[in-house]
Amino acid sequence: MKIKLAKTELIHFIGIGGMGMSGLALIMKGKGFRVQGSDISINKNIERLKKEKIKVLIGHKKQNINKATILVISSAIKKNNPEMLEAIKKQLPIYKRGEMLANIVSLTKNIVVVGSHGKTTTTSLIASIFQETKIDPTIINGGVICLLYTSPSPRDGLLSRMPSSA
């Protein structure tokens, strides 16, 4: 699925504090999009997003999406979420995290690590090889890789570790 996005879009992530959603928000910001989001409580991912100057609203209220033009939702979001209901009422495009991730991945060459066990470790090893050889891909990983920058950034290539729930 190709998602047409303009840099003027304001992408609102419902459930932005999750590992996958926070990483996706950072990548979209790094690609030049305006990004904000909401979650039910503060966690380390949200603190990291705020350091990167991403607006994060605590709690789910329909007012949170007043200026949003696109929504990205986590799989944890229920259909009766007030932000989701307001987006439906406003006829805003709503994408699942996996759909937005697939759109990003479709724009570049990729290495994808899949399997039952060891995906984060394998992705980390590949990332360290790239770092040592001065290849500079965007890395999407289900865990935090300590040897790398804490924020993803847009590159020409992409290394992705697909979570089981993608």
Predicted regions and their residues:
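Phosphate-binding loop of NTP-binding sites
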Residues: 4, 27-33, 50, 63-64, ...
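Hydrophobic alpha-helical segments, chiefly the membrane-spanning helices
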Residues: 162-166
